[in-house]
Amino acid sequence: MKQFMDEDFLLSNDVARTLYYDYAKDQPIFDYHCHLPPKEIAENRQFKDLTEIWLAGDHYKWRAMRSAGVDENLITGNASNYEKYQAWAKTVPLCIGNPIYHWTHLELRRPFGITNTLFNPQSADKIWQECNELLQQPEFSARGIMRQMNVKFSGTTDDPIDSLEYHKAIAEDRDFDIEVAPSWRPDKAVKIELPQFNDYIKQLEQVSDTEINGFDSLKKALSKRLDHFDKRGCKSADQGMEIVRFAPVPDEKELDRILQLRRNEQPLTELQISQFSTALLVWLGAEYCKRNWVMQMHIGALRNNNTRMFKLLGADSGFDSIADRTFAEQLSRLLDAMDQNNQLPKTILYCLNPRDNEMIATMIGNFQTGGIAGKIQFGSGWWFNDQKDGMERQLQQLSQLGLLSQFVGMLTDSRSFLSYTRHEYFRRILCEMIGRWVVNGEAPNDMNLLGNMVKNICFDNAKAYFK
């Protein structure tokens, strides 16, 4: 019987262990998509206690606590940090079988060094004291943890109207050598159907010093902000796409009319919404291509399902799930519309519904281009797929239908500075899968070949892709 989460956790054979320890384990982290607050990095936040760094904003943990029957006051309410922590300690033993159980113990192991101890109500007080003492040390500040985890790059998620003042401060700080770059998230400008669209356009007018009275002036305003992001080192754009829409792009006169209808609070048809979003995304794709940015598309979330809790807590609070819309044809036509003028940027496609894995894995082959290895990527298992089975499915289907060797690897997609251990989780799963291939005679026992492939997937491919 194996020991729980020992040093060889998830590594069942000698090949997997060699690949992990000799090629994967010590690779730096290129975390190209996350939701860390740049303010906390710029100000090098020192967290007061374990609840602040571990539970605040972590909707994975919040969902588990709700499923365990924990009162909302002990999750997002006014209970003390210690009370919230104790509620989490009571919840964790109930999470066996959920990746949260593994993540919890990995997050205690690194960076806190707590091993051979199960997290539960009995161990909670000792762990609380030990971790809170460590959190007062410089090595456990926001920047200190990033250094401990060997992070080389962090791509945050930012709105076009953001000032990026904290990215500027980080870049100008000669005492901090980790690159922190903004990522452009234009959802509020693209999704003309959102209730807050008109208020957002007013904000965009202010920050861009541009009156938006038509589609061309909207592009001018966004172009100014694109330049601002580019100046601050942006390498990537990210689209959240609950619905993948496509419609043939009409002339600019019709786009002006659609925008004017919306500015006048008039209802739009589904066709008009699709025409507007298609036109803007195709234009944005060309702008990304011109700046050599990567375009990421996160497809298939069903958001804010619980109206009562949305009114109470707002978005990103743990009330989202997997949607089941089909979107293959719309996605194909959208990518093709960008590609027809050779203006499809490097692109990473993520799907939330694992049903869509094979579709995405084959879709990327339609738009690959000579001169850019792996130009179009099937992104790592996202959100609800960010677990052992989900990661294995994505890796297997990419390897079967594309080129695993060109994969840009893992990202945290997290709001927590303790989530970097997800890279370790991914690397162990990757090495175990390849190790099984070798043991079964499905891949050669060539450590130079396989080791370099693992090394590339863990770091080098992403570094080259986002250059």
From Swiss-Prot:
Task: Report disulfide bridges, numbered on this chain.
Answer: none
Q: Hey, which family's this protein in?
A: Belongs to the metallo-dependent hydrolases superfamily. Uronate isomerase family.
The record lists the catalysed reaction(s) as: D-glucuronate = D-fructuronate; aldehydo-D-galacturonate = keto-D-tagaturonate
Q: Name one GO molecular function term.
A: glucuronate isomerase activity
Gene3D superfamilies attached here?
Answer: Metal-dependent hydrolases (3.20.20.140), uronate isomerase, domain 2, chain A (1.10.2020.10)
Protein's name according to its UniProt entry = Uronate isomerase
Domain of life of the source: Bacteria
A GO biological process this protein is involved in? D-glucuronate catabolic process
Q: In which pathway does it act?
A: Carbohydrate metabolism; pentose and glucuronate interconversion
Q: Which organism is it from?
A: Mannheimia succiniciproducens (strain KCTC 0769BP / MBEL55E)
- The EC code for this enzyme is 5.3.1.12
Keywords on this record?
A: Isomerase
Q: Give the InterPro entries listed for this entry.
A: Metal_Hydrolase, Uronate_isomerase
Q: Does the keyword Isomerase apply?
A: yes
